[in-house]
Amino acid sequence: MAQDRECLCSAGFQRGDYTQGNTDRSTAAANSRPPAGQRGAEEPSSGGAGTPPPAAVLPTMPDEATENAGSTSARVSSFFIEDLLGTEGGGGTRRAAAGGGGGRGAPRCGPHSPLRLGASGCPLRDAAVGWYRRAFLGCASPDTSDRDSPELPEDTERAGGGGRAAARGPAGGRQSSGGREEEEERGEEAGEAEQRAAGRKKKTRTVFSRSQVFQLESTFDVKRYLSSSERAGLAASLHLTETQVKIWFQNRRNKWKRQLAADLEAANLSHAAQRIVRVPILYHENSPASALGFGLPHMSPPLVGFSGGVSYPLGTFPAASLPFLRSQMTGLV
């Protein structure tokens, strides 16, 4: 029993030492920590190289501050002369001199403010206002807008393509008005051409009275072609123009030629039909063969009868048809 009590006492003593050691350590750590205000100031220095400090706490150098201020001021469109001259510096005077020498020698009125600035510091409105001011003061004509207008950087020109068109307002207006006038003139010319073509197509046909047609027909039967004097006299007597009489005679001659061609064609067809028709030959049975006179041409030939009841002598037939007649007669016998 005594041994058990000694073991328990030793165990409790060790446990008490352990808890006391832990409490001593916690108090020492609490005492070693700095106050809240000092802790925020010391944390950036004790952070190490691996962890970057916050951006708001980083100290800024004077050069960086001036650069940031210059960039913000350049981004903001400022219209003060001091800002414009300060941003460009000494290079502005050289550019202004080069730009002035590149013109056509037009006189410059008043002080020339340099407008050729960077893309961020040169607004397009300044260029337009300066150009209009010079144009209205009579320093330069609007026709020389390409050379007298201030040259802008490429970025500004791309960004403000519509502004340049606005800056060329007077010249563009003239060109557009001239183009409209040309289009109107072309439209009028096209309309006149259409009217002329329509007038040519709508030719009215001359209507002749019965008395005029009778007189023209009687004159045509007498003479197919008229001289100029005859045509003039006929036109005066019929109260017509010479052109109308001339055209009527031309049409009448064409009609007459067509009628002649049709008559000739009909005559040729009838003649061909007459050649094709064959007529059978009949002879008398009692008449001897020697009486026909084929071998004696000096004797008067007898009559040969046809089916139509008409008799023709053999002398009327040509000599070439005698073999044909002989073959026909021998075939019938």
From Swiss-Prot:
It comes from the Eukaryota. This is Homeobox protein HMX1. SMART domains: HOX. Belongs to the HMX homeobox family. It is found in: Nucleus. GO terms for molecular function: DNA binding; DNA-binding transcription factor activity, RNA polymerase II-specific; RNA polymerase II transcription regulatory region sequence-specific DNA binding. The lineage of its organism: Eukaryota, Metazoa, Chordata, Craniata, Vertebrata. GO terms for biological process: negative regulation of DNA-templated transcription; regulation of transcription by RNA polymerase II. Residues 87-105, 159-176 have a biased composition (Gly residues). Residues 17-30 have a biased composition (Polar residues). Residues 1-74, 86-109, 139-204 are annotated as: Disordered. It comes from Gallus gallus (Chicken). GO terms for cellular component: nucleus. DNA-binding protein that binds to the 5'-CAAG-3' core sequence. May function as a transcriptional repressor. Seems to act as a transcriptional antagonist of NKX2-5. May play an important role in the development of craniofacial structures such as the eye and ear. InterPro entries: HD (IPR001356), HD_metazoa (IPR020479), HMX_Homeobox_TF (IPR051300), Homeobox_CS (IPR017970), Homeodomain-like_sf (IPR009057). Residues 144-158 have a biased composition (Basic and acidic residues). Residues 181-192 have a biased composition (Acidic residues). Keywords: Developmental protein, DNA-binding, Homeobox, Nucleus, Repressor, Transcription, Transcription regulation. Residues 201-260 bind DNA. A motif (HMX family specific domain 1) lies at residues 261-271.
